[in-house]
UniProtKB/Swiss-Prot annotation:
Gene: rnb
GO cellular component, one term: cytosol
Listed name of the protein: Exoribonuclease 2
A GO molecular-function descriptor: RNA binding
Cellular compartments annotated: Cytoplasm
């Protein structure tokens, strides 16, 4: 009787259109209920039975019910699922498989089966890649996934590496492929094998891609010759190896090992500027004036060079600081090191005055055992030898940026626009409240930005600097020349690491076209998009493996009285994040550990401060002592507590 009743259908339609709805993202809690977050200000409660239809992170449209003045959300339509492809641990019970996603807020096992064509016999504890196939809001009875790839066994000591690489869909191994002979590039190569080129790297480095040689000229000028490994002498554009390198975009450096962009035969041997071996190179010769400026007379050319010494950062630094027993192999090498130190001092002084110099932060190195166990974490400060190489490379990249801009008008450039124009008024107001006056338009210019950075660097603490970081834009990779505000330079194009960066290989080919007087094609924007995406994924992978190893390293310190100095790096509503000074681990201090009475505590992300009873007790950049309260291995998170 009611089946096709148009009035009833109309009534249903009316009710449906009058019912309030909201779109938002589901946030799960550990208690079974959840919230629909519509925006930063508004969220609705989702009761536990309704949470069974959704997953943390799902974007949904929900019906909003009001009962006794209490609002709650009933998820109705899935806009975008949080999980599509994911990694997790397999559970096997009575021959039935399920998988628990590796995510701090996803605790429930999802029923699953192996996809057709996946031959591995999955066992309890295995790690796998899975893809979601069913979702309750799509009309399915429940969640369901398919296992698309076996990652490794639960007991594998190298789980942190394999799981992280699978999560970000990154390669596990060096690419296959060989380059048997050098290409005929129609390039005249100068013979520089008699010159005393040296390489300075970590003692364990095999992929040496830069060698340096300095000559003193009259008029207190120094001539610096930078020779860079030449993989494009072996790899033709559009070849199989070139396409592999284009996809990988970078060598992926993870704690303990790297996954190279090029086959190891090339990166660690044929192209590597090994001591005592003749190698093709792309070379830049420049003159450094007495005040550290680079003269306009920049010369790029192809050459054959032979490194006369493979030097290690620590040895060179010790020798220059008159420590330790190491001595250069000959007076000629000693003379090179002294001249390189002069180059470094001149360039550093010039950049301090005319551009910007990053503050030295230590690198943290994981010392690993045979089974991936963390034996130690060593802070390696950036010493004089590191700075020699850094200043030489920055100078060479400035030269390439100028030459590519003036001769071609394009290349692969690293650009950084400084502050986001939409937020400079806010920035000026914030700085003014701390007694610093800046013009909102002035900081959008390179000189204005540099002036502000120098003023911030002169502050007694880094607190103000940390407050304005959120107004800064991100560095980008562009085919158009443009300023790099972060370095304080008008243009910056890297070409000094072609073994490990595809963009540098592209710039090599463009520089070679200039050397030969040939025309060149502008790199495609898709290539720079791929580079930016790979850079992001590689950084995330490095961070994820690091978090896992830090958790392993600090596990036996949990609940003990071991004290660690820690710098506060961020304040949020729930507490504050700190970085342990000695090893670089990031830990979280929950708000209740800061003060027991919640109403007397204000944690402000906006101000970067923690106030107790109206008084600022902690602020970002403060260094405090902490102990490790807990290490949660399943989420790789470290919980710390301030020492009273």
């Amino acid at each position: 009787m009611f089946q096709d009743n148009p009035l009833l259908a109309q009534l249903k339609q009316q009710l449906h259109s009058q019912t309030p709805r909201a779109e938002g993202v589901v946030k799960a809690t550990e208690k079974g209920f959840g919230f629909l977050e519509v925006d930063a200000q508004k969220s609705y409660f989702i009761p536990p039975p309704q949470m069974k239809k959704v997953m943390h992170g799902d974007r949904v449209i929900a019906v909003i019910h009001t009962e006794k003045e209490k609002e709650s959300a009933e998820p109705e339509e899935l806009i975008e699922p949080f999980l599509t492809r994911f990694v997790g641990r397999v559970q096997k019970k009575d021959d039935r498989l399920s998988i628990v996603p590796d995510h701090p807020l996803l605790k429930d096992a999802i029923p699953c089966r192996a996809e057709r064509g996946v031959s591995h016999d999955f066992q309890n504890g295995d790690w796998a890649v899975a893809e979601m196939r069913r979702h309750p809001l799509k009309g399915d009875r429940g969640f369901y996934a398919e296992l698309t790839q076996f990652i490794t066994f639960g007991e594998d000591h190298f789980v942190p590496w394999w799981v992280t690489l699978a999560r970000h869909n990154l390669e596990r191994e060096a690419p296959d492929g060989v380059a048997t002979e050098m290409l005929d590039e129609n390039l005249t190569r100068e013979d520089l094998t008699a010159l005393d080129f040296v390489t300075i790297d970590s003692a364990s480095t095999e992929d040496m891609d830069d060698a340096l040689y300095v000559e003193a000229l009259d008029g207190d000028r120094l001539q610096l010759t930078v020779a860079i490994a030449d993989p494009t002498a072996w790899i033709a554009e559009g070849s199989k190896l070139d396409n592999i390198a284009k996809v990988r975009a970078f060598t992926n450096y993870l704690p303990g090992f790297n996954i190279p962009m090029l086959p190891r035969e090339l990166s660690d041997d044929l192209c590597s500027l090994r001591e005592g071996v003749q190698r093709p190179a792309l070379v830049c010769r420049m003159i450094i004036e007495a005040d550290g400026a680079i003269s306009d007379d920049i010369h790029f050319f192809a050459a054959i060079i032979e490194s006369k010494a493979k030097l290690a950062y620590d040895d060179v630094s010790d020798w220059l600081e008159e420590k330790g027993d190491w001595q250069p192999g000959s007076e000629a090498i000693a003379a090179q090191i002294r001249l390189l130190q002069q180059i470094c001092q001149r360039r550093s002084a010039w950049r301090t005055e005319h551009a910007l110099v990053f503050k030295d932060r230590p690198d943290y190195r994981f010392v690993l055992g045979e089974k991936g166990e963390v034996l130690d974490i060593v802070a390696e400060p950036r010493r004089i030898a590191n700075r020699i190489v850094e200043e030489s490379m920055i100078a060479a990249n400035i030269c390439a940026a100028r030459v590519l801009r003036d001769k071609l008008g394009f290349g692969v450039y690293n650009v950084h626009a400084g502050f986001d124009p939409a937020s400079t008024e806010q920035l000026a107001t914030l700085l003014q409240s701390h007694g610093m006056h800046v013009d909102a338009n002035d900081v959008l210019t390179l000189p204005g930005f540099c002036k502000l950075r120098r003023e911030l660097d002169a502050q007694p603490s880094g607190f103000l600097d940390s407050r304005i970081r959120r107004f800064q834009s991100f560095a980008e990779i562009s085919t158009e020349p443009g300023p790099h505000f972060g370095l304080g330079l008008e243009a910056y194009a890297t070409w000094t690491s072609p073994i490990r960066k595809y963009g540098d290989m592209v710039n090599h080919r463009l520089l070679k076209a200039i050397i030969k007087g040939e025309s060149a094609t502008r790199p495609q924007d898709e290539a720079t998009v791929q580079m930016a995406e790979r850079r992001r994924l590689n950084r995330m992978a490095e961070r994820d493996v690091g978090d896992w190893l830090y958790a392993r390293f600090l596990k036996d310190k949990a609940g003990t009285d071991s004290r660690f100095a820690a710098e506060i790096i961020d304040v949020s509503r729930g507490g504050m994040r700190v970085r342990l000074v000695d090893n670089g681990a990031v830990a979280f201090i929950p708000a209740p550990f800061l003060h027991a009475v919640r109403d007397e505590l204000v944690c402000s992300q906006e101000n970067g401060t923690v106030q107790i009873k109206g008084e600022t007790v902690y602020k970002v950049t403060d260094v405090i002592d902490v102990t490790i309260a807990e290490v949660r291995m399943e989420t790789r998170s470290v919980i710390a507590r301030p020492v009273a």
